[in-house]
């Protein structure tokens, strides 16, 4: 038996989950928020209990020490030595990492930092988490698991952009995708639920949270995905634009005071757009739906645009694969919002997909929510990226 921690490090946060492996039992999970502040918050959930404290945490290294000390204080572990492995979620692996990798050299961490060009909001923070654990637990197995790795099976026709070739060969501008660990997990879980080999299935996986992406999974491999060069591409999201005409950028630079620097573009497109930008209210779908029900026109438009973009991608991916066996919803909105699922799927009667209202509205919902007669099954599967990360730590530990 071993104890493995799955880590998702943000710029000011550290989300974690501790597993007993290979049993895959969750011993504890938690979140450290406001790293770098005097009023940071560390929360630990274990055995149906929750412990929280507010304290100063100056950086990620201090956060890791607090995390481990909390585990000892709460009698979840006896000493640091019980932790045998750590797996880190990393958003961008580029073409350099096509699978999870051991952090067995400084070069691996430096490469993760270099790839921040592809995920400026994520990779530097991911690397900070890796360095923090290396400093405090230098001898345990350390693994990096990439959001982009699952999508490295996309054919060139799907991942290339129609730009001059030199921008691909010299600057590596292409589609990389994201949320790959989530898409991988729910695709494989769907195959188990449907009791069919994943090699025989054509699936469309729909990851709907604050970030949203869809993937066409043919025979267990990603053949197309909605997010692009960065997680900004694809469908409309909580605060991100998704795809739009590139000519919008120079137009706004010429005609407004808001778009003067690349940082302005990144900030507005990543943090001020999407549901938030259209509704002028919130990036939270629950608030958007409540406002829509109350007759708020901006919220209604945001809601309908969100659904519209997802419908179009599902239809496109069914065509890309020349058919589809199942559509799988996951992540915060995908798992919890029955109305959104219903609104999306009512556009696919022609495909042979349906939703049984009683199954769809059951809470919690898990598994098939379509009728037995449906040609295309519809499923809801809670994602578990942390478990995939823990499994990869165990797999690479034994290599």
Swiss-Prot record:
Q: Name one Pfam family in it.
A: Acetate_kinase
Its annotated pathway reads: Metabolic intermediate biosynthesis; acetyl-CoA biosynthesis; acetyl-CoA from acetate: step 1/2
The note on the cofactor says:
Mg(2+). Can also accept Mn(2+).
This protein's GO CC annotations:
cytoplasm
Listed under catalytic activity are: acetate + ATP = acetyl phosphate + ADP
Q: What is the E.C. number?
A: 2.7.2.1
Question: For this chain's UniProt record, which GO biological process terms are given?
Answer: acetate metabolic process; acetyl-CoA biosynthetic process
Give an example GO molecular function: magnesium ion binding
The record's NCBIfam families line, in alphabetical order, gives:
ackA
Q: Give the multimer and partner information.
A: Homodimer.
Protein family according to the UniProt entry: Belongs to the acetokinase family.
Name the chain's protein. Acetate kinase
Tell me the organism.
Streptococcus mutans serotype c (strain ATCC 700610 / UA159)
| Gene name of this polypeptide | ackA
């Amino acid at each position: 038996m071993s104890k493995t921690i799955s880590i998702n490090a943000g710029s000011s946060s550290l989300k974690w989950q501790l597993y007993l492996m290979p049993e895959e039992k969750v011993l504890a999970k938690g979140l450290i928020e406001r790293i770098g502040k005097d009023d940071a918050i560390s929360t630990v959930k274990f055995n149906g209990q929750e412990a929280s404290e507010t304290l100063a945490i100056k950086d990620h290294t201090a956060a890791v020490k607090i995390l481990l000390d909390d585990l000892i204080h709460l009698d979840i572990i006896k000493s640091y030595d019980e932790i045998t492995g750590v797996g880190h979620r990393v958003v961008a692996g580029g073409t350099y990492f096509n699978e999870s990798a051991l952090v067995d050299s400084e070069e691996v961490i430096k490469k993760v930092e270099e790839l921040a060009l592809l995920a400026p909001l994520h990779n530097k923070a991911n690397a900070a988490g890796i360095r923090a654990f290396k400093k405090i637990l230098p001898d345990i197995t350390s693994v990096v698991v990439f959001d982009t790795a699952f999508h490295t099976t996309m054919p060139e026709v799907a991942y290339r952009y129609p730009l001059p070739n030199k921008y691909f060969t010299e600057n590596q501008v292409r589609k990389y995708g994201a949320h790959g660990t989530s898409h991988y997990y729910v695709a494989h879980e769907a195959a188990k639920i449907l009791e069919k080999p994943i090699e025989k299935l054509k699936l469309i996986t729909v990851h709907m949270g604050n970030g949203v992406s869809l993937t066409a999974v043919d025979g267990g491999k990603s053949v197309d995905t909605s997010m692009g060069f960065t997680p900004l591409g694809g469908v409309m999201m909580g605060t991100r634009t998704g795809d739009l005409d590139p000519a919008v950028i120079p137009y706004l630079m010429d005609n407004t005071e808001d778009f003067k620097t690349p940082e302005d573009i990144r900030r507005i497109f990543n943090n001020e757009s999407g549901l938030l930008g259209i509704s002028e209210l919130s990036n939270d779908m629950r608030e958007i739906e409540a406002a829509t029900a109350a007759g708020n026109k901006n919220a209604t438009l945001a809601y309908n645009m969100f659904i519209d973009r997802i419908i179009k991608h599902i239809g496109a991916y069914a065509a890309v694969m020349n058919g589809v066996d199942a559509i799988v919803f996951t992540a915060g909105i995908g798992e919890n919002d029955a109305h959104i699922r219903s609104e999306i799927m009512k556009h696919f009667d022609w495909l042979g997909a349906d939703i049984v209202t009683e199954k769809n509205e059951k809470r919690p919902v898990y598994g098939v929510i379509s009728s037995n007669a449906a040609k295309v099954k519809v499923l809801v599967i809670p994602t578990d990226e942390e478990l995939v990360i823990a499994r990869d730590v165990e797999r690479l530990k034994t290599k």
